[in-house]
Amino acid sequence: MTMAYTNSNLVVYTKLSPNHSGARTHSIDRITPHCVVGQCTAEGLGDWFAKSSTQASSNYGIDKDGRVGLYVEEKNRSWCSSSNANDQRAVTIDTYL
């Protein structure tokens, strides 16, 4: 079965990161939340993930005002949880403290 990937229609800001592994090797069957410490904006996280030196990313981020940013399209594996096996099958979402 081939999975059709879509990106959330809740996204209000997009800045695609170079930090990903390309096409997934597993269909999406989980969500992985990840915490970003600090009061970031969707744009600020996009700027951080846009740096190749960061070597991190997520599919989405939800900022301090509840705005959703897209950083790695769902069809691609982000570099979020430090687990290839997890990130291949998860939509990863950074949230803010």
Name each model-derived stretch.
Residues 2-97:
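Active-site-adjacent loop/helix surface patches within enzyme catalytic domains
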